[in-house]
Each structure stands twice: as structure tokens, then as C-alpha cells.
Amino acid sequence: LLCLQKYSPGRETSQTCLAGENICFKKWKKGEKTSRXGCAVTCPKXK
């Protein structure tokens, strides 16, 4: 099953990941054009 998680580090970003896997999202700094990548907690199983 796939789970959808929304992250809003200034912008609403949604990424899909397999249950039990780690998903990565990009963090945008204000005034900077660089993006930092981070790993979120594993996707919740079920549902």
C-alpha cells in the first residue's frame, strides 16, 4: 500500500512512499535558491 504525506516547509510538498519505507523531502530556505534534503519518518503501515 502507498501512503501520502504532506510537508509544508514554506511550500506544500506531497510525496508518495511504500509503507515502511523512508520518504525524502526538500527544504527550501527563504531568500536562498538551495534546497536541503531530509528524510522523514517511515510511512505508517496499513490504511
From Swiss-Prot:
Family, similarity comment: Belongs to the three-finger toxin family. Short-chain subfamily. Orphan group III sub-subfamily.
Entry annotated with the keyword Cell cycle: no
The protein, known as: Short neurotoxin D2A
Disulfide bonds listed in the record: 3-24, 17-39
Family matches, as InterPro entries: Snake_3FTx, Snake_toxin-like_sf, Toxin_cobra-type
Transmembrane segments: none
Keyword Disulfide bond part of the UniProt annotation: yes
GO CC terms of this entry: extracellular region
GO terms for MF: toxin activity
Compartments, as annotated in UniProt: Secreted
Entry keyword set: Disulfide bond, Secreted, Toxin
Tissue: Expressed by the venom gland.
Short name of any one Pfam family annotated for the protein: Toxin_cobra-type
Main location: secreted
